[in-house]
Amino acid sequence: IPHEELTTEFIKRGIPAEKLVPTGIPVSERFLKLPEKREARGQLGIPADKSCILMMTGSMGYGRVESMTAKLVEQTGEDTHLYILGGTNEELKKTLRDTYADTERVHVLDFTTEAHLYMAAADILFTKPGGLTSTEAVAAKVALVHTKPIPGCEDRNVAFFTQHGMSVSGDTEDAVIQNGLKLLRDPEAQAEMRKCQEKYGKPYAADAVCEFICGQKEAAQEEA
């Protein structure tokens, strides 16, 4: 399971405690071996002297991306660049590119396998509160802003992350944007969030899973 503090919730849903192992969610080791921000920006061609907002929409390009992009552009200046990972949603990407064809600070990107580098390069990340992407963001230690969740498990993700200082969010789209921009402009708040991510995150979950499985195998062999 993602974290030991969630053990009681799983037990209440009928799963025996002895079946629960709080390893965290495994992520690619690419998120654990990231370059420094300046180096990542150099690799991606992102200006070193600009603020960088990263927006991830998921591989299918879901979310209120057009509305949020418009508000972020309106409420930031020329010193802030916005990078949108548009996934495979060609219609969304075309709409955004047409809308912002006259500005050099909105960058609409195709599906990429370099999300880890963009996280390393970004000052803050706006993303839907899916479990895997959120865990990757914590592993990358990027200041995290959760957008509107899908009712259900994503609601719980937002609650857990915000309660533990690992992200900010809001009840409305405007509140999400305001809280995100406040975080962007507050390096001390970003640093504090990274401390919380380091404290509560489990970036080495894959190792923990392997160790548990190997331990179970060894125990079974000893009993045989």
List the predicted regions and their residue ranges.
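A nucleotide-sugar donor-handling region in carbohydrate enzymes
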Residues: 1-59, 88-91
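Short, glycine/polar-rich helix-capping loops at beta-to-alpha or helix-loop-helix junctions
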Residues: 6-10, 92-96, 133, 152-158
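Short alpha-helical segment that forms part of, or immediately flanks, the ligand-binding pocket
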Residues: 116, 134-140, 159
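A short alpha->beta transition loop at the rim of the catalytic pocket in nucleotide-sugar-dependent
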Residues: 122-123, 141-143
